[in-house]
């Protein structure tokens, strides 16, 4: 199966470099919806939003004309471009990580082809943005004059650019689909290969154990013991590798936990320092207010006592 997968990838790569008669580009109608694909990926959905926005721009309606004279359309297209290429890059890197089981040279060629297809798609979207920016400059230079010819040229350019965008998007989608299928096949093949290698060993072990139990020959027992040691060595080796991997993961988790605890300690110390600072600020104020309040209460009490003693005197 591995040979078939490698042959498929090499054939696809070679076919992309062969000189063939160019197929006629599909006619892209103004109102044509983004084709989309079954079980579409996030990058395909983002590209669909770019396509729908471009379709709206291509109507060259009064609202489009007004926003083209500002920077709104170009800014919104830039946001959609960045979102699309970000999703494409993330999906491509995910597939490259899953292609680890294939040969290093083949993997490098696959990565190169995916990057080239991604670059073509980015170039198509950049051409759209550049053409709209150019149209905006030309319209502003011809303020007060008829712009029908410019609008016609822009509409023609946008139709051609949408054809290229559709063609290169479908090319990238087909490549990613092929490589994704190969990655899934490679993962399943790795599990099957391990099962195929260990299955015969287990069966042989059972057969040898049964044979040793029925034979009294010391030579056969020694051979069985040697085979047993060999099998145990292989199992221990695989177990050691698994433990090393788990230990590495544990160390990484410990590092993360230590960093989190360190940051938590720093935040706690900062909070305590801030609390102490606040306390040092407000304690003198509170004490001063308490003293003033006590003095005020004392004065009120003294005034009330003076008033009560002077009242009887006046009665006499």
UniProtKB/Swiss-Prot annotation:
Map the sequence repeats onto residue numbers: 79-100, 101-122, 123-144, 145-166, 167-188, 189-210, 211-232, 233-254
Indicate where this protein is primarily found. secreted
Q: Which residues carry this modification: Methionine sulfoxide?
A: 142
- Specify where the region named Homooligomerization lies, as residue ranges: 265-316
The segment annotated 8 X 22 AA approximate tandem repeats runs over: 79-254
The signal peptide stretch is: 1-18
Region listing for Specificity for association with VLDL, in residue ranges: 277-289
Quote the InterPro entries the UniProt record gives: ApoA_E, Apolipoprotein_A1/A4/E
What Pfam families does its record include?
A: Apolipoprotein (PF01442)
Region (LDL and other lipoprotein receptors binding): which ranges? 157-167
BP terms from Gene Ontology: acylglycerol homeostasis; cholesterol efflux; cholesterol metabolic process; chylomicron remnant clearance; high-density lipoprotein particle assembly; intermediate-density lipoprotein particle clearance; lipoprotein biosynthetic process; melanosome organization
Modifications after synthesis and translation: APOE exists as multiple glycosylated and sialylated glycoforms within cells and in plasma. The extent of glycosylation and sialylation are tissue and context specific. Glycated in plasma VLDL.
State the GO CC annotations: chylomicron; extracellular exosome; extracellular matrix; extracellular space; high-density lipoprotein particle; intermediate-density lipoprotein particle; low-density lipoprotein particle; multivesicular body, internal vesicle
What molecular function terms (GO) are annotated for this protein?
cholesterol transfer activity; heparan sulfate proteoglycan binding; heparin binding; identical protein binding; low-density lipoprotein particle receptor binding; phosphatidylcholine-sterol O-acyltransferase activator activity; phospholipid binding
Which sites bind heparin? Answer: 161-164, 228-235
Record carries keyword Glycoprotein: yes
Q: Where is this region: Lipid-binding and lipoprotein association?
A: 209-289
Subunit notes for this chain? Answer: Homotetramer. May interact with ABCA1; functionally associated with ABCA1 in the biogenesis of HDLs. May interact with APP/A4 amyloid-beta peptide; the interaction is extremely stable in vitro but its physiological significance is unclear. May interact with MAPT. May interact with MAP2. In the cerebrospinal fluid, interacts with secreted SORL1. Interacts with PMEL; this allows the loading of PMEL luminal fragment on ILVs to induce fibril nucleation.
Homology family: Belongs to the apolipoprotein A1/A4/E family.
Per its database record, what is this protein's job? APOE is an apolipoprotein, a protein associating with lipid particles, that mainly functions in lipoprotein-mediated lipid transport between organs via the plasma and interstitial fluids. APOE is a core component of plasma lipoproteins and is involved in their production, conversion and clearance. Apolipoproteins are amphipathic molecules that interact both with lipids of the lipoprotein particle core and the aqueous environment of the plasma.
**Full protein name:** Apolipoprotein E
Q: Which gene encodes it?
A: APOE
């Amino acid at each position: 199966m591995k040979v078939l997968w490698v042959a498929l990838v090499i054939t696809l790569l070679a076919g992309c470099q062969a000189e063939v008669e160019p197929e006629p580009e599909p006619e892209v109608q103004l109102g044509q919806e983004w084709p989309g694909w079954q079980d579409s990926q996030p990058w395909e959905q983002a590209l669909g939003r770019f396509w729908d926005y471009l379709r709206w721009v291509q109507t060259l309606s009064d609202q489009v004309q007004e926003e083209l004279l500002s920077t709104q359309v170009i800014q919104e297209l830039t946001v959609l471009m960045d979102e699309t290429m970000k999703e494409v890059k993330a999906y491509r890197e995910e597939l490259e990580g899953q292609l680890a089981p294939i040969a290093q040279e083949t993997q490098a060629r696959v990565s190169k082809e995916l990057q080239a297809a991604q670059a073509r798609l980015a170039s198509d979207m950049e051409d759209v943005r550049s053409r709209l920016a150019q149209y905006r400059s030309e319209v502003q230079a011809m303020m007060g004059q008829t712009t029908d010819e410019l609008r016609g040229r822009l509409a023609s350019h946008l139709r051609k650019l949408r054809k290229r965008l559709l063609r290169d998007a479908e090319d990238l989608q087909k490549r990613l689909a092929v490589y994704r299928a190969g990655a899934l096949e490679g993962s399943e093949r790795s599990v099957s290969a391990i099962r195929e290698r260990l299955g015969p060993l287990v069966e042989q072990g059972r057969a040898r154990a049964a044979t040793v139990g029925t034979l009294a020959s010391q030579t056969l027992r020694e051979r069985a013991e040697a085979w047993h040691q060999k099998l145990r060595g292989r199992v221990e080796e695989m177990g050691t590798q698994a433990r090393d991997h788990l230990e590495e993961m544990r160390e990484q988790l410990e590092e993360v936990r230590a960093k989190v605890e360190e940051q938590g300690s720093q935040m706690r110390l900062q909070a305590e320092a801030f609390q102490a600072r606040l306390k040092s600020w407000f304690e003198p104020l509170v004490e001063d207010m308490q003293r003033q309040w006590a003095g005020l209460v004392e004065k009120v009490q003294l005034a009330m006592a003076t008033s009560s003693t002077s009242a009887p005197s006046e009665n006499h």
